[in-house]
């Protein structure tokens, strides 16, 4: 054991001195105080599985790779272990160890992961992944707090695989050294990261260097770095951070005047930055006077509403004649404190006293991010009448203001929310009558028509829809109004006229929601009706050959242009880095590189096409779809309907059946049409298993709280954590289960189930109660634009799948 340790130390020393030739066997790094045991064919520490007939080790590796891609770690462990146990091939065994190490790392079984990666690097040093094992060991050591060992592992990786992801690996190495208290080597690593052209966030690494310099006592260098970052950036948040960090250095140097000058500068200039609040706290603690207006702003944006209130009050008391901005923010502080009545009164005073203030129009209404009077009245105080009257008063007082038609439209929405449907319809009529040039006119007339349809006043509704149809200039608006003209004529018993309207609607855009629903009406087909059979017998090789030829002809490429490989892209540093990151399991970093490369080649149709195919082969569906879409855009196929004229290869990828080995069983288990679930998944994440928007995560965009709720109810997966949402197996399993619950709750109504999935079951229930059994009316009554568009978009996706995969007679 001692010999092994000495050998490791000697190799590491040679690497650090730059003396390791490319052909050297990869040195091993010990994961602990003892050499870990090797995984042997008789090892029983992992589960074994012997299917019949017995797959070959090569087939088991393929199965395991598919399983790890799907987040099915149990199957991956079994298959990798079986491949190792049943093969004498060094290549197979090395691949199995690499797979086992990755899975154990993913499930945070760090001890086993280190043992496995150690075995790979020591027993199979010529394997392509033996060097990568050192990077993963570095990640694991860092997670365990064994930072010196982490730094050494990164060092070996960089020495044996230089010039690939140096910027990233050097930064990780620097972080490990810094955490270990070795700031000198940390600075060296960080500087190496900065020197690499692949650096992603240069200021962040520069800050790390400066912080290490401070710890080493070199404050002069650190201050110089902060000043250079400040001078080079236009980002106010970064400028505030530099002011704060510089000021903190001056405090440690015993130069408080210099420090407070920096702190005052950030408070006065960058009120939105939280670092400005940290500077403010330092100033307050030191008793340094400052402008109360700026102090109040910093406090407000830091969420310190009580302190903000006091600062604004002092400013107002000291400056009774001012422009009113302090009064405006005073109202916002009341709102932040939950004193909604006081906030409304404060906005009242501001509105009456400061009509020339730039915040005057916003104060009348507001929104979720920056509330105002009407928003607070209806959303927090349930004063719908008063809120609507606030907005109507604004229109009366400022009829020429750019916000007037917007507020008039919103007043109608508030009246509708309050059940005053006749008033709402008349208010929406006013938008068209008083602001005929507004872009809001088509939707205002449409909403007026929907109100009259709900009231059973079909003749009046028909007039509103017809007027909307005449004034609409956007095809989608025209399809919307024509569809409802047909619905209204049908309600009036005018069947022939309704059929004519729907025929006209269907012809506008066969991929649009309203055109699709018109097609449904013409054949008496309910929304989301399943295909009797899904045809998945495509020939991707033949389809790609057709697409290759089409790309050559469409973009005037020479007949011998090779589109079968990535070509020169294989030498592109971004593609090389992205592929390496992906192999290491760093999908987010890989995505950054692939996205950047997609942007770089976006005007080159051949390279866009090559990149799309390459990314598809890696299972990077999200960026691949964007690359293929860009090819169609360059071919002047900007609309969805225009893409139908392209070779089917493009749309079979853009609307692919990805993750089908998980999705089909999950759909069958929960009683869903697989196309329906696939459409939801495409809408939610565009097949990006690491999608993260707001609080929602994964393929099915489940929030952590909802995920925990579903997992608790199902008792699956075992030991559930939020990170499991990024596993396709878990995301699809939980998502389909939750959708099934909503479908059951709403008696099989899929549109309402989707609304519940997106906006919550309580809101969906309210909308369904208002609409009754009419699904089309339900969609229009939905009060959240996001949810309404969500259902429409999913049905458009569903329509594409239906047209692409319907069985050909």
Q: Locations of the language-model features?
A:
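Structural motif corresponding to the intra-repeat A-B loop/turn of tetratricopeptide repeats
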Residues: 70, 107, 144, 180, ...
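Alpha-helical segment of the N-proximal tetratricopeptide repeat
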Residues: 55-82, 86, 106, 290-314, ...
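Short solvent-exposed coil/turn linkers within tandem alpha-helical repeat scaffolds
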Residues: 51, 84-93, 121-132, 157-168, ...
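Residue-level recognition of tetratricopeptide repeat
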Residues: 65, 102, 139, 175, ...
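Catalytic glycan-binding domains that act on GlcNAc-containing polysaccharides
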Residues: 404-409, 418-423, 427-428, 434, ...
């Amino acid at each position: 054991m001692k010999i092994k340790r000495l050998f490791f130390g000697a190799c590491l020393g040679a690497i650090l001195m730059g003396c390791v030739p490319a052909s050297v066997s990869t040195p091993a790094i010990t994961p602990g105080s003892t050499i870990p045991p090797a995984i042997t064919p008789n090892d029983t520490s992992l589960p074994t599985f012997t299917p019949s007939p017995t797959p070959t080790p090569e087939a088991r590796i393929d199965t395991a790779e598919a399983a790890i891609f799907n987040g099915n770690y149990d199957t991956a462990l079994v298959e990798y272990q079986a491949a190792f146990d049943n093969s004498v091939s060094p290549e197979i065994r090395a691949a199995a160890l690499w797979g086992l190490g990755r899975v154990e790392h993913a499930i945070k079984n760090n001890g086993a992961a280190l043992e496995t990666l150690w075995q790979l690097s020591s027993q199979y040093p010529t394997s392509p992944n033996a060097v990568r094992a050192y990077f993963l060991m570095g990640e694991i050591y860092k997670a365990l707090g064994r930072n010196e060992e982490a730094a050494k592992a990164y060092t070996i990786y960089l020495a044996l695989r230089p010039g690939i992801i140096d910027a990233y690996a050097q930064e990780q190495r620097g972080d490990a050294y810094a955490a270990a208290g070795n700031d000198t080597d940390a600075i060296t690593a960080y500087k190496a990261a900065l020197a690499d052209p692949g650096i992603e966030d240069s200021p962040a690494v520069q800050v790390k260097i400066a912080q290490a310099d401070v710890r080493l006592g070199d404050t002069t260098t650190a201050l110089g770095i902060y000043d250079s970052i400040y001078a080079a950036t236009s980002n106010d948040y970064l400028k505030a951070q530099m002011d704060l960090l510089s000021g903190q250095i001056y405090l440690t140097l015993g130069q408080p005047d210099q420090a407070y000058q920096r702190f005052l500068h950030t408070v006065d200039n960058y009120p939105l930055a939280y670092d400005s609040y940290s500077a403010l706290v330092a100033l307050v603690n030191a008793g340094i006077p400052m402008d109360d207006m700026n102090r109040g702003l910093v406090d407000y944006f830091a969420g310190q509403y009580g302190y903000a209130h006091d600062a604004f009050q002092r400013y107002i008391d000291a400056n009774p004649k001012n422009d009113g901005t302090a009064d405006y923010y005073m109202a916002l502080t009341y709102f932040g404190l939950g004193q909604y009545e006081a906030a409304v009164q404060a906005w009242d005073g501001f509105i009456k006293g400061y009509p020339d203030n730039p915040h005057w129009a916003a104060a009348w209404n507001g929104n979720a991010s920056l509330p105002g009077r009407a928003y607070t009245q209806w959303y927090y105080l349930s004063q719908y009448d008063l809120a609507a009257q606030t907005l109507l008063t604004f229109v009366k007082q400022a009829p020429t203001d750019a916000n007037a038609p917007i507020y008039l439209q919103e007043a109608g929405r508030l009246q509708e929310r309050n059940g005053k449907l006749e008033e709402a319809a008349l208010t929406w009529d006013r938008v068209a009558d008083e602001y005929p040039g507004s872009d809001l006119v088509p939707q205002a007339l449409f909403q007026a028509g929907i109100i009259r349809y709900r009231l059973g006043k079909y003749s009046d509704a028909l007039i509103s829809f017809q007027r909307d149809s005449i004034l609409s200039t956007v095809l989608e608006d025209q399809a919307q109004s024509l569809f409802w003209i047909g619905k209204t004529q049908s309600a009036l018993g005018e069947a022939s006229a309704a059929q004519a309207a729907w025929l006209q609607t269907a012809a506008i855009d066969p991929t649009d929601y309203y055109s699709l629903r018109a097609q449904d009406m013409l054949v008496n087909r309910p929304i989301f009706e399943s295909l009797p059979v899904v045809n998945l017998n495509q020939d991707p090789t033949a389809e790609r050959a057709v697409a290759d030829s089409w790309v050559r002809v469409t973009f005037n490429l020479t007949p011998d242009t090779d589109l079968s490989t990535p070509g020169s892209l294989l030498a592109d540093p971004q593609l090389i880095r992205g592929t390496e990151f992906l192999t290491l399991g760093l999908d987010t970093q890989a995505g950054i590189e692939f996205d950047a490369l997609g942007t770089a080649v976006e005007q080159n149709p051949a390279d866009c096409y090559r990149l799309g195919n390459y990314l598809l082969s890696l299972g990077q569906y999200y960026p691949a779809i964007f690359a293929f879409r860009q090819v169609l855009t360059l071919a002047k196929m900007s609309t969805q309907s225009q893409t139908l004229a392209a070779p089917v290869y493009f749309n079979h990828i853009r609307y692919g059946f990805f993750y089908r080995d998980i999705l089909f069983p999950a759909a069958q288990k929960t009683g869903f049409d697989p196309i329906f679930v696939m459409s939801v998944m495409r809408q939610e994440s565009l097949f990006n298993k690491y999608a993260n928007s707001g609080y929602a995560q994964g393929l099915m965009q489940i929030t952590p709280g909802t995920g925990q709720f579903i997992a608790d109810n199902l008792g699956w997966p075992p030991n559930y954590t939020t990170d499991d949402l990024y596993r396709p197996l878990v995301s699809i399993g939980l998502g389909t289960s939750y959708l099934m619950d909503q479908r059951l709750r709403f008696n099989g109504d899929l549109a309402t189930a989707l609304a519940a999935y997106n906006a919550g079951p309580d809101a969906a229930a309210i909308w369904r109660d208002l609409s009754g059994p009419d699904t089309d009316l339900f969609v229009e009554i939905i009060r959240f634009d996001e949810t309404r568009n969500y259902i429409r978009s999913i049905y458009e996706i569903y329509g594409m799948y239906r047209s692409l995969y319907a069985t050909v007679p």
